[in-house]
């Protein structure tokens, strides 16, 4: 059997001597580290899209996008607009939470024009025939410095008349 080096004291280094409870602290910290990936797999930190649907006499608006995201995440928001009667000047107005500290990578199909309305993003979609579904996709990336909760209200207008409003909240984790 090999001789124990002079600098190793078995009672202290192998048996933990007076620090026997320290092993439970180390195991507890290791357990906490292991919990984070499990919570991510259970979608606690987001990424899976949630669908919100709002309906009125004139139109139905559906939004499918994650409500919880992490910094650096790439994701897509889908807006489905189905008018029950023709919309002459369809406009989608997005609250500041749709653009604040989020990078818009692409928007398809491109709106006919974009405007700013008191910090909100207005997307002019043009006319939409009754019964026809207009689908708008916006691809995002979450800026790493963005943390916290943001209002992501969406309102569908026909001209100056608000048709449908959906209230959503986006939670951004570090």
Feature locations, PLM:
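A eukaryote-biased signal for short, well-structured alpha-helical docking elements
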Residues: 2-4, 12-56
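Serine/threonine-enriched low-complexity regions used as flexible
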Residues: 146-160
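Low-complexity, intrinsically disordered segments enriched in Ser/Thr together with acidic residues
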Residues: 129-147
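Short aromatic-acidic-glycine turn motif
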Residues: 97-114, 161-162
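Short beta-strand edge segments in extracellular beta-sheet folds
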Residues: 169-174
């Amino acid at each position: 059997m090999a001789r124990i080096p002079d600098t190793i004291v078995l009672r202290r280094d192998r048996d933990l001597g007076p620090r026997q409870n320290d092993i439970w602290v180390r195991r507890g910290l290791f357990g906490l580290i292991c919990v984070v990936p499990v919570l991510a797999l259970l979608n606690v930190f987001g990424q899976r899209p949630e669908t919100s649907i709002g309906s009125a006499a004139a139109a139905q608006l559906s939004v499918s996008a994650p409500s919880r995201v992490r910094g650096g995440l790439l994701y897509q928001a889908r807006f489905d607009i189905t008018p029950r009667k023709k919309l002459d000047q369809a406009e989608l107005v997005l609250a500041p939470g749709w653009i604040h500290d989020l990078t818009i990578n692409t928007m398809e199909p491109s709106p006919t024009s974009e405007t700013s309305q008191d910090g909100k993003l207005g997307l002019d979609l043009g006319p939409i025939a009754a019964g026809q579904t207009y689908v708008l996709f916006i691809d995002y990336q979450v800026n790493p410095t963005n943390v916290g909760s943001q209002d992501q209200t969406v309102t569908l207008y026909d001209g100056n008349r608000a048709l449908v409003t959906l209230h959503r909240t986006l939670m951004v984790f570090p």
